[in-house]
Amino acid sequence: MEELRERVWNGTINVEVVVSDAIVVPNTTLADKSCHIVMLRDAYLGFYLPTVVRKLADTIKVPYESDYRNWWFEYNGEGVPWEYPCGVLFDLLNKKRKKQGNELDDTSLQMWELQLCHGDKYPRGILPLVDGHSQIKDYWRHQWKQACFILNGSAKRIMSLSIPDFENFWVSILSRNRSDFMAVRSKLFSMNKAKSLPVRVWTSNYAVLQPTVPVTDKELSVAELLDSIKLSSDGVKSVIIQGIDVSIEDNIFELYDIFASIDGFLYLVTK
């Protein structure tokens, strides 16, 4: 169990980023206008934006003043939100992913191909990332307030964290120090005393649902959860959590304990 948690924490995605045709220097080769980067599944796209912009700076024809402001990523012409973990977005958007028995075939190892875009007008649904890490940090804190409220019935625990504890919590994500992360997380809730679980379900049409999952029913299965939110488990071909196809018979309580993301939520992607 602990080994699986460690693998989830260190899980990565291979990503190819190509500069959008709208902002690339004319006649730039594909090799020059693209870069490859390994992104952590349990991290935010915004973490990687400055690195990508700097790597591709020589091929960008438009002037810019910030590595964050007016930048965004697109996938197949659609804006990709930065406020969800990278792995969740990849599992949701990757159309080439196929399952073969209990294992994924080689298509799961293909690059996630993103476009780097810039402009004053953001695509619909894209939250402007203006203040860089500080904005991501504030958003992440807000997510934990929501998660704590669901888990404990109030956000008191996250609000009452000492400044050193909160800073250590944040830095543990950036430095990938799982032991520090778990040490602070343990102060925010206890699985044995939780009231409900913070769960988000992405549907095949890209809608995100946030059902109420009371822990009074510790035998609640994925299938029962889907049925409760009018997503017939019979019509769902697969349920993906942290890149892993899970059984609809799996226990939600146990899945949360293993697979909850850095923002306190368990994400289920249905297809």
From Swiss-Prot:
The keyword DNA-binding does not apply. It comes from the Eukaryota. InterPro entries: Atg5 (IPR007239), ATG5_HBR (IPR048940), Atg5_HR (IPR042526), ATG5_UblA (IPR048939), Atg5_UblA_dom_sf (IPR042527), ATG5_UblB (IPR048318). The keyword Transport applies. It is a peripheral membrane protein. One of its GO terms (biological process) is autophagy of mitochondrion. Conjugated with ATG12. Interacts with ATG10. The ATG5-ATG12 conjugate forms a complex with several units of ATG16. The ATG12-ATG5 conjugate also associates with ATG3. Kluyveromyces marxianus proteins are shorter in length and have a more ordered secondary structure than their S.cerevisiae counterparts, which might contribute to the superior thermotolerance and solubility. K.marxianus could be therefore useful as a new model organism for further elucidation of the molecular details of autophagy. This is Autophagy-related protein 5.
